UniProtKB/Swiss-Prot annotation:
Pfam families: ATP-synt_D (PF01813). Residues 213-224 have a biased composition (Low complexity). HAMAP family: ATP_synth_D_arch. This is V-type ATP synthase subunit D. InterPro entries: V_ATPase_D (IPR002699). Residues 201-212 have a biased composition (Basic and acidic residues). It comes from the Bacteria. Gene3D superfamilies: 1.10.287.3240. One of its GO terms (cellular component) is proton-transporting V-type ATPase complex. It comes from Deinococcus radiodurans (strain ATCC 13939 / DSM 20539 / JCM 16871 / CCUG 27074 / LMG 4051 / NBRC 15346 / NCIMB 9279 / VKM B-1422 / R1). The lineage of its organism: Bacteria, Thermotogati, Deinococcota, Deinococci, Deinococcales.
Length: 224
């Protein structure tokens, strides 16, 4: 970058201002990254808990299903399973976590009992239906939590790349510019000082010659 800038004092001031801005930007990005990392690990715990909950409710639901199949007729079990194949509405909003847009899902309360055909069904079949409703809720929770986790992770990588670019490319480049400008300005100052000394010496030499000439003329007049 040094060869592309004009080595002037105004350019030096501009480079110093750019360096201050770049350092400030890097510090802000680091703080953002640290906050996101903290949020990421909190979400990891939530995601693991959601997965464990899904595993637990799934086991319970299949246990209920096996009991329903053992005690109720296949028609009753199928009737109640078909009753739960309708649309499952969730309330999804978008929230911002340190500037990262992530989904916020509110799971609505399920009805106490699903609609089903008027076939006589037992309590075990109804319980199995309710348990699988819990599985669906757990799946939605896992999906929402892991989506947040993925987006936060992507933002951490993006922020880290920006920090690295500033610290490894931009800031060192500005330092190079400042060193280049200072070296040129220092060289110019030395050259200007050397030139001034030469001019001063030349002027003093001429003044000395003039004084000597004047003195010689004065002595000559006195002799006459």
């Amino acid at each position: 970058m040094a060869g592309q800038i004009s080595p002037t004092r105004s350019a030096l001031l501009a480079s110093k201002a750019s360096l201050k801005t770049a350092n400030g930007g890097a510090d802000l990005l680091k703080r953002k990254r640290d906050a996101l990392i903290g949020e990421f690990f909190a979400l990891v715990k939530d995601a693991l808990a959601a997965r464990e909950q899904l595993s637990s409710v799934s086991k319970g639901a299949y246990t209920s299903l096996f009991g329903a199949k053992a005690w109720d007729s296949p028609e009753a079990v199928e009737s109640l399973s078909l009753a739960g194949t309708g649309d499952y509405a969730v309330d999804m909003q978008i929230e911002s976590i340190y500037g990262v847009k992530v989904p916020k899902i509110n799971i609505p309360e399920r009805a106490a009992q699903a609609d089903f055909s008027p076939i006589n069904v037992g309590a075990r079949t109804i319980q199995a239906s309710n348990d699988f409703g819990g599985v669906l809720e757990a799946i939605v929770k896992v999906a929402a939590t892991e989506t947040k986790l993925r987006r936060i992770g992507e933002e951490i990588k993006k922020t880290s790349r920006r920090v690295n670019a500033l610290e490894q490319v931009v800031i060192p480049g500005i330092h190079d510019d400042i060193r280049f400008i200072r070296s040129v300005l220092d060289q110019r100052e030395r050259e200007a000082g050397y030139t001034q000394k030469k001019i001063k010496a030349k002027i003093e030499g001429k003044n000395k010659e003039a004084r000597e000439a004047a003195a010689a003329t004065s002595h000559g007049s006195a002799a006459d």
